[in-house]
Amino acid sequence: MKTTIKNSRTQESVSYEGNETKKGTGETLSYETSKDIEVPERLIDQIIGQEEAVETIKKAAEQRRNVLLIGEPGVGKSMLAKAMAELLPREQLQDILVYPNIEDPNNPLIGAVPAGEGRKIVMNHKNKARSQDEKKNLFMMLIISFILVLGFMMNQFLAAIIAAGIIFLALQQFRPRTTVMVPKLLVNNEGRQVAPFVDATGAHAGALLGDVRHDPYQSGGLGTPAHERVEAGMIHKANKGVLYIDEIGTMKMKTQQELLTAMQEKRYSITGQSETSSGAMVRSQAVPCDFVLVASGNLQVLEGMHPALRSRIRGYGYEVFMKDTMPDTPENRDKLVQFVAQEVEKDGRIPHFSREAVEEIIREAQRRAGKKDSLTLKLRELGGLVRAAGDIAKSRGAELVETEDVIEAKKLSRTLEQQIADRYIVQKKKYSVFKSEGGEVGRVNGLAIIGDRSGIILPIAAEAAPAQSKEEGRIIATGKLGEIAREAVQNVSALIKKYTGTDISNYDIHIQFLQAYDGVEGDSASVSVATAVISALEEIPVDQSVALTGSLSIRGDVLPVGGVTGKIEAAAEAGIRKVLIPASNMGDVMIEKKYEDMVEIVPVETLGDVLEHALIGKGKESLIQRMQKISDIVPSIMKKPAMH
């Protein structure tokens, strides 16, 4: 995409070359379909674009270090944790048994044996108990038979039957319970070839740390022995393996403290987690829980983490910040080809992709990166697009997913924000909240982003009225503005003084973000606000077929903003014919082909460039000439610093 404009200050033609959506993918892999791509067996080799994190995980696995992974959702944090379980050194896994304690029933004993031996021990104890029961049953049957035979011989049939029944009940009542001596298999690692991986995300204290069942419905009846009511926690099941906790900062502080204790001691006793239950009276011996903790979350999670827990991870492990984009190189595009093949293999219900369909997925990865020369690493969302395209191809009975299926899948798998944005544009246009033709004083079509990349039209109106205060005028902005947005509006006053030469101390300038009920945050509307205010002060109409976005410095330079692709596409959907964006954002533009002929994209460097393209009417030329004179005068009258 190549766009040429004239710089309003120098009158020189300046060309800008942006990323083309038609840009060749240039993969080094040779393939016809994704079926030709070999999918690695090891999970660690399936992780895309996180080379630094992978190297850290390998070191952590080799030395059994804890890891804290911080990053955006969908960049591969849980996959890294699972891969670490495969990489852990092969150790002797253990089965954990809990035995009854004859001396103190509320303090069950704990035993650890090699994996696979636990079930054998339990079966041996059960067989012994069963053998004892059979002997006792045989003895009881002999006694009852003797009584019955004796009664028949003495012609006392009824008395013999009654006596046999009484003896049977008595023997049952006073029969010693040998079955209570059978241990319970708490953790079973039989047949496991790799270290256990336990996902404890969202687990409550009982599930994480272990618990003791305390009511008849849970424990199996009144009088159930204490050791049979003991339940292992996830920290015990992760012994010699990996315990993964996502969004660890949402966990209660008390639970984090107990988790820290388990990490330090590598053993943790199981007790009832409810203080008001009978299970709280039971406390087992310390149960082995020698696990590697892999915690994850976003940056906000750090605020909710216990300082000592984070210190433990940092002191005995690593902190890793995950990338959300990777450079757009042939090697990295090859990795996305591998990613498509992996997703097809994992799903198992969708057909493979043709080469052209894979290239369309790569182009979408470029768009979703949101910046030039980059590919997105939010692969969970990209995987959703792969599966949606596969579903479409499957529904039409195709053997391969083609480019048309991927394009159709983009519509099918739109995010909630994108669907809301589409309806927002239709509704606002229907009721003329924003306009896409004609000219109007003090009214500008700004552009904004909701969610990650869904653009919307943000109409802004400005009006200049005589100041109510005798001392000075004010800038009054409405529309639930956030802190950054309020500061951006305040900065506009300096630009108005510089570019118009107007003394605004005699005016109250009112700025309204029309129907912005959900609030406005960020400074990407600075250009729009400045244009609306200057239009209102000078009474020069703004072209309503133009939409604009960009941040402003107090010197009038247009600074880059995020989400330009989504904003441009939203403007095109709304019928806008020209969009002004910061010149430094031109490389980030990756709009869909269908929008290329619908809208003209104009890069701007200064507020003067913006006004030249946004304003219309007879007063425009005189304003721009006056602005140029003021811009030339201001530097010349500035005092030079004194030389000593």
UniProtKB/Swiss-Prot annotation:
Topology relative to the membrane, per the entry?
Multi-pass membrane protein
Top-rank taxon of the source lineage equals Archaea
Q: Where is the Lon proteolytic domain?
A: 438-617
Transmembrane segments annotated in the record for this chain: 138-155, 156-171
Where along the chain is the active site annotated?
524, 567
The main location is: membrane
InterPro entries per UniProt: AAA+_ATPase (IPR003593), Lon_arc (IPR004663), Lon_proteolytic (IPR008269), Lon_Prtase (IPR027065), LonB_AAA-LID (IPR046843), Mg_chelatse_chII-like_cat_dom (IPR000523), P-loop_NTPase (IPR027417), Ribosomal_Su5_D2-typ_SF (IPR020568)
Q: What does this protein do?
A: ATP-dependent serine protease that mediates the selective degradation of mutant and abnormal proteins as well as certain short-lived regulatory proteins. Degrades polypeptides processively.
Protein name per its UniProtKB record? Archaeal Lon protease
